[in-house]
Amino acid sequence: MAPPTWRHLAFVSDLHLGPEAPATTAGFLRWLGAEAWAADGLFILGDLFEAWVGDDLLDTGPPDAHHQVCAALAAYAADGHAVHVMHGNRDFLLQQGFAHRCNASLLPDPCVLDLGGQRIVLTHGDALCTSDAPYLQWRALCRGAEWQARFLTQPLPARIEQAAAMRAQSRASQSRMDTWSDADPFEAARWLQAANSRWMIHGHTHRPREHWDHGQLRQVLSDWDLDAPAGGASHRAQALWLHAGSMELAAERCPGACIHR
C-alpha cells in the first residue's frame, strides 16, 4: 500500500540505459534531477538497463553508465523519493546488491499498488505476450534459480559476451518478424479480474497507448530512445504521472530529457 502522504507518482519503463545509449542515459539523468523531483515515488517497470549480467558489474572496471545511473538513483532516493524497480526481459538479473547500491526496492512482477483505495496492477508486460510461445519458454527458463546460478558462476567477461550474443540473436529474430508480439488483452483482463482491479500499467511492447475495455484501463508506457534520429517517431522519452488527488493519469513528454545531444 502506498503511504497516505504520497500525492504524485511517476512511472517509466524500457529505458534500455547503458554505454550503448549515451544520449538516452544522459536524458534520464537530467530528468531524474529535474521533472522527476516532483514525484513521491518513482516506479521503473522493467528494462531500466539494456542488459544486466550480474550485480558485480558495479564492482569492476572504470565507472560507466551503469555506475552513473545507480549513483543518481541512490542520490534521488536519499533525498526522500521512493524508488521501485521491476525486472524486465533485459535486466532480469538485477538483485539485492543493485537494490542496496541504489537505495531502491525490487518489485515482484506482477504486483498491485494500492493508492488511496485504488488497486493498480503493475507489470513489465512481457508475460502478457501469450502469442510468443518461444519467448515465454525462454522466460520461464532464465527466471529459474538453477539457470541464474549457473550463469552467474561464469566470469564477468564471459557473461558480457553471452549477453551481447543473445541481444544480437533477439534483434535478428525481430527483424524477421512481420509484427512484434503484443500484449494479449484477454490475458490482461484476466489478471485484472484476479487482482480485483480495473487499472493496469505496463511497458515492454514499446507501443504507448491507453486501452479501455469494459471499464478497465490498460495503460502502456513509452520506451525511451534519445539515441534515435531527432524528429523521428522512435526519438522519445515519456513518463506517466499519477496524481492521487484527482486519480488522474497523465502521460507527459519529458522536456528535460528530450534535449538533443
What feature does the model see in each segment?
Residues 2-12, 17-115:
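Core catalytic region of metal-dependent phosphoesterases/phosphodiesterases
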Residues 112-115, 226-227, 257:
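A short acidic, often aromatic-flanked loop/helix-cap motif at beta-alpha or helix-coil junctions
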Residues 123-184:
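Active-site-proximal loop/helix segment associated with metal-binding centers of metalloenzymes
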Residues 101-108, 119-121, 126, 131-137, ...:
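Conserved beta-sheet core of the metallophosphoesterase superfamily
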Residues 250-261:
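Short, solvent-exposed aromatic-acidic interface loops
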Residues 90, 111, 127, 223, ...:
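Residues that form or immediately flank small-molecule/cofactor binding pockets and catalytic motifs
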Residues 28-31, 52, 138, 147, ...:
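Tryptophan-centered motif/residue detector
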Residues 14, 20, 39, 107, ...:
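Hydrophobic/basic alpha-helical segments enriched in Actinobacteria
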